[in-house]
């Protein structure tokens, strides 16, 4: 019996509870490379099945990398040193640089929060989902808040990844540059959260798939993988 047939015969309440687990299982079994599956397995269990990002409490993710200290403080990467100097000179303050007094009314049809054609409501109507103009406006607002919430959660992951890279990288100029990346990601977290909190007044939970990526990066011992993941997020 396939999954679809099984879901069809289940009572509605039971189906709504077990459906996310079947979807999570499909995601995990879609990974064909056994090495990738093994590396993502623990994070997938914590994110997709246990839903550690949706329990309403801070999440503890064990780190396995080593912090690399160099007590001679060498100047060992001229390119990184140059990036560090540029990053210092280009710092900006999100609290001061952005005009937070700008009024944002997500329900104002005259100033849509996202383009009206961003969502194909005609396609939804083909499936029997018909919304009033007010419902369409609210739906666009909710979609925007959800997307920005995931950006925010991703930036928190990038913030922690940058901090871990700074600890684990083995050339000292890279650590100096990494410190500026930590500040950059902190600024992103600050700005995204403030916009969601003061303008949209809504924050969605972290997406399970995004949690898996963040969990896998945080617990990976390789600094270069953390650096790559930081750029992706």
What are these regions (language model features)?
Residues 210-214:
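Short linear capping/connector segments at secondary-structure termini
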Residues 215-220:
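Active-site lining segments of carbohydrate-active enzymes
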Residues 151-159, 178-196, 231-232:
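Alpha-helical transition-metal enzyme core signature, strongest for iron centers
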Residues 224-233:
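Acidic/serine-rich, low-complexity amphipathic helices located in mid- to C-terminal regulatory regions
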Residues 136-140, 179, 233:
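Conserved short hydrophobic patches within well-ordered secondary structure
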Residues 1-163, 168-173, 198-205, 209, ...:
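Terminal targeting/low-complexity segments that flank the catalytic cores of oxidoreductases
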